[in-house]
Regions:
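Structural signal for the C-terminal ends of transmembrane alpha-helices
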Residues: 1-6, 115-124, 186-193
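Membrane-water interface at transmembrane helix exits
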Residues: 23-27, 121-125, 145, 149, ...
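Hydrophobic alpha-helix feature that most strongly marks membrane-spanning transmembrane helices
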Residues: 46, 66, 116-122, 126-129, ...
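Membrane-interfacial segments
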Residues: 26-27, 31, 121-128, 161, ...
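Transmembrane helix-bundle signature of multi-pass membrane transporters/permeases
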Residues: 84, 99, 139-143, 171-174
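Hydrophobic transmembrane alpha-helices and their immediate junctions
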Residues: 103-147
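Hydrophobic, glycine- and aromatic-enriched re-entrant/interface helices and adjoining loop segments
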Residues: 6-106, 128-131
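A juxtamembrane structural motif centered on a specific transmembrane helix
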Residues: 146-200
Length: 200
């Protein structure tokens, strides 16, 4: 029963890919990428040939990271956040962290995220049921991918995507969802088989 069902999933997946390739190749009127998406990818692939206006945000993000040095310019002393790095309080806040707190501050922030993710995985491994385990793992994967994508965009490893840095970026809905996820994780940890530090 299980093998037959898996075979149908594989056949369905292959058929979906074939249909998608046919649609993309024969129907040029279907916009796969919007113009601004194509510009972002093109400016990321052709860094030297691209007009500086299209790479303004990314270039100044790299300037901010580079000018921070090892210990940074000091908290609140960033120059790039004043109309050079647009969205410096949302998508590109990691570059301002790098400018103000330097390499040490960036490592500290990434270390805190690593500790959070490791603790979430530990909670998932000790969860009472499969739902709690999958919930904890899913939340940690989502936060880990969001952090990795944000840092990759800020360091020009990936094209600009507009993904915020959890807990640091300004934004109501993103912060609300992230804090809600932490509430779910704490609920799983409350019922998990974890060593208790306090007995209240």
């Amino acid at each position: 029963m299980g093998e037959g069902r898996a075979r149908w999933f594989v056949i369905g997946g292959i058929a979906a890919v074939i249909v998608l390739v046919i649609v993309i190749n024969f129907y040029d009127d279907i916009p796969i990428l919007k113009d601004y998406m194509a510009d972002r990818i093109g400016s990321w692939l052709n860094k030297d040939l691209t007009d500086t206006d299209k790479r303004w945000q990314t270039n100044h993000s790299l300037f901010a990271l580079g000018s921070g040095g090892f210990f940074g310019s000091g908290l609140g002393n960033s120059k790039q956040k004043y109309f050079y790095v647009s969205e410096s309080h949302t998508d590109f806040i990691f570059s301002i962290i790098g400018e103000e707190l330097g390499f040490v501050g960036c490592c500290l922030v990434l270390g805190l995220f690593a500790l959070l993710i490791l603790r979430g995985i530990y909670i998932g491994m000790r969860a009472r049921d499969r739902f709690g385990a999958l919930l904890a793992f899913g939340i940690m994967v989502q936060i880990g991918l969001q952090v990795a994508l944000n840092v990759a965009v800020v360091t020009d490893t990936l094209p600009n995507t507009g993904i915020s840095l959890p807990f640091f970026s300004y934004g109501g809905s993103s912060t609300l969802v992230t804090l809600g996820e932490m509430g779910f994780l704490l609920s799983v940890s409350r019922q998990a088989d974890l060593p208790r530090l306090y007995s209240f």
